[in-house]
Design a protein with these regions (language model features):
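Conserved hydrophobic/aromatic beta-strand scaffold that supports enzyme active sites
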Residues: 17, 98-100, 110, 126
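C-terminal glycine/acidic-rich active-site capping loop/insertion
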Residues: 65, 75-92, 98, 123-175
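Beta-strand scaffold of nucleotide-dependent catalytic cores
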Residues: 15-18, 110-113, 136-137
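Predominantly a Rossmann-like dinucleotide-binding segment in NAD(P)-dependent oxidoreductases
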Residues: 1-90
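Contiguous C-terminal substrate-recognition/catalytic subdomains in enzyme active sites
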Residues: 89, 100, 115-118
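Glycine-rich phosphate/pyrophosphate-binding beta-alpha loops
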Residues: 107-120
Length: 175
């Protein structure tokens, strides 16, 4: 919600562009029955997309054009935990997606959602405006530090706590 306040206060000016990323090795690493995430109707867009897309709409307004490409890097996955550990299951859907989203305000944001990345620790979004840049924490976590930079090398760390925000009733960004 701190990101929403920064935008409302014009802290980074008019937002021109941005990017977001959620990269993860897949549900087979942490769930004993992950197959539904890899069947038709599953995948990273269905699982994580709503968090990132609703946050972007909350911060930038409606999207007017979206282009996407999905890729499936493997036809099988292996259970890594649970009673089926070591067994394989079929993958039916794309497991990595790249996005190009154009908003009504003419901002363009690129994104990447993936169940194919083994080691990544920067799940977040960045927005770049005419007066500065902002790093928004992973929307799936509903809070965390927001970094604001207005000139080369400068950063502001703020803690986004939904319970103290004037936007508390919409803390998940879904209204």
């Amino acid at each position: 919600q701190l990101a929403r306040e920064f935008i409302d206060n014009g802290e980074i000016g008019k937002i021109l562009t941005g990017n977001f990323i959620f990269a993860f090795p897949g549900m087979q690493t942490c769930h004993p029955d992950p197959e539904s995430w890899f069947k038709k109707g599953g995948g990273p867009v269905i699982d994580m997309g709503p968090y990132f897309f609703t946050t972007l709409v909350n911060l930038l307004g409606p999207a007017k054009n979206i282009r996407s490409r999905g890729l499936k890097f493997s036809n099988n996955r292996t259970y890594e935990i649970g009673p089926k550990k070591g067994q394989q299951f079929n993958v039916e859907v794309s497991t990595s997606y790249m996005f190009d989203i154009e908003f009504d305000n003419n901002a363009v944001v690129q994104g990447f959602l993936s169940f194919d990345v083994n080691n990544h620790c920067q799940n977040h979004m960045e927005l770049y405006g005419t007066e500065g840049s902002m790093i928004v924490p992973d929307p799936n976590m509903f809070g965390g530090p927001v970094s604001l930079s207005k000139e080369l090398g400068s950063k502001y760390q703020g803690q986004s706590d939904p319970t103290t925000s004037k936007y508390y009733e919409n803390y998940s960004g879904r209204q």
